Amino acid sequence: MEQFHGTTIISVRRKTPEGYSVAIGGDGQVTLGNIVVKGTARKVRKLYHGKVLAGFAGATADAFTLFERFEAKLEKHQGHLVRAAIELTKDWRTDRVLRRLEAMLAVADSEASLIITGNGDVLEPENGIVTIGSGGAYAQAAAMALLNHTEMSAPEIVKKSLEIAAEICIYTNMSHTIETLP
């Protein structure tokens, strides 16, 4: 059976006078092969009492499994994002069921932005931009330009980057969900 796939998830961290503003967004398109089966899926959400932003790309059922496991790690480690991500990837690499999951997570809190890969790696990009999914490279290029050459806020950059990705990537649509942290 074919997997549900294709999406764009982007998180942007922008320096503000008060610290950092963080936003994450994703499109709503879910495809099965070459057919769009849903256009308004919610692939980003707030976790751990609204203090952590997370989004997924990949097989939907696998992503929900990872969300649940990641949220359990956040609870266990009192919301410490990096520690929870590392502990999740330790499990991911040693658990036979988790090793077969085909999904990636983009996660962020007030201090860090991370990519948790399907290989069980934790990556922290240097520029505060995290992208995953089929339209990720397009959204990343747009966000880099907007972050470096405009005064747009993090949520504005996320929105515009998703719009640009949707114009290029056939697996990304214009139905967006955006979540923010102050």
Curated annotation (Swiss-Prot):
GO term, biological process aspect, one: proteolysis involved in protein catabolic process
HAMAP family given in the database record: HslV (MF_00248)
The reaction(s) this protein catalyses: ATP-dependent cleavage of peptide bonds with broad specificity
Taxonomic lineage from the root: Bacteria, Pseudomonadati, Pseudomonadota, Betaproteobacteria, Burkholderiales
GO molecular function: metal ion binding; threonine-type endopeptidase activity
UniProt keyword Oxidoreductase present: no
Main location per the UniProt record: cytoplasm
Active-site residues, as the UniProt record annotates them: T7
Entries under PROSITE patterns matching the protein: PROTEASOME_BETA_2 (PS51476)
Name by which UniProt lists this protein: ATP-dependent protease subunit HslV
